[in-house]
Amino acid sequence: MVLSSNWLSLQKSTDSDSVNKNKGGKKTKSNSKKRTVSVKKDKQYVDKKKKNGTGSKIMDMVANMNREIAKVEQERTKNTHADGQMINSEDRFESVLKQKLNEDVAKKSLSRTNGVGKYVSMDCEFVGVGPDGKDSALARVSIVNYYGNVVLDLFVRPKEPVTDWRTWVSGIKPHHMANAVTQEDCQKQVSNVLKGRILVGHSVHHDLTALMLSHPRRMIRDTSRHMPFRQKYSEGKTPSLKKLTKEILQLDIQDGEHSSIEDARATMLLYKSDKLEFEKLHNKQFGPSKPTQE
């Protein structure tokens, strides 16, 4: 911020108020005269500023600037590790996830939090196939349990040649295909995990279509279709996972390469953040469901 010339003049005139002393500690005659003139000018200047209200405005501007600087410094401190390294969004997400996991795990047995349980969250990543890579092909599937622990994480080998890895958004690279499974094998493993369980996802029908699988509607909880989320954060339209995670969890995801594990965890956290309302609306549509364990 560049201060006005009036503010600089006020600083300069204020500095001239300091009494200059000679080596013996006595005031010089010339300095005394200068001080008298300076005090008069300062008084006239300040009186003029008070009359016009300019001085108070400048002071308010400086105070606001100091407050903004303090906010920036506070945010920088919050986003910095003890060793001075900046915390990226993935680190922050992992930190919050671990905190929430610890809150849940403290109330449950270890076998329960590590097991698959009744609730799972799934997310998929895709690569480009066909001319110019415009068509999408499944390349990774990740499933986590109610507590965010990984249940299944598979890289999938597309049947068609990959023409665009879309690494900048999918996070998929050629070397991931070294241990990739076929789509048929992936489909079988995912089907076994989903059977009899409540599936949490974001626009999950896209992922199910890519897997060529179906799942009972009464067993699906889709954060993209949850009406309270749509009304509050997207004016009734379909909100993005990134937007919901930012608005509700105060976390930034998908800033660079996507991670299907990270997205699946974020989706589960979103569901848990409004679980009671999810189930209330779901029961209105499909009728009361049997109590389920996590």
Curated annotation (Swiss-Prot):
Residue intervals passing through the bilayer? none
Predominant place of localization: nucleus
Class of this enzyme: hydrolase
Q: Does the keyword Cell cycle apply?
A: no
Q: Return the annotated region ranges for Disordered.
A: 1-56
UniProt domain Exonuclease: residue ranges: 119-271
Q: Where is the composition biased (Basic residues)?
A: 23-38
Q: Which CDD domains does the record associate with it?
A: REX4_like
**GO MF entries:** 3'-5' exonuclease activity; nucleic acid binding
- PANTHER family to which the protein is assigned, alphabetical: RNA EXONUCLEASE 4, RNA EXONUCLEASE REXO1 / RECO3 FAMILY MEMBER-RELATED
* UniProt protein name: RNA exonuclease 4
Q: Which organism is it from?
A: Kluyveromyces lactis (strain ATCC 8585 / CBS 2359 / DSM 70799 / NBRC 1267 / NRRL Y-1140 / WM37)
Q: Which gene encodes it?
A: REX4
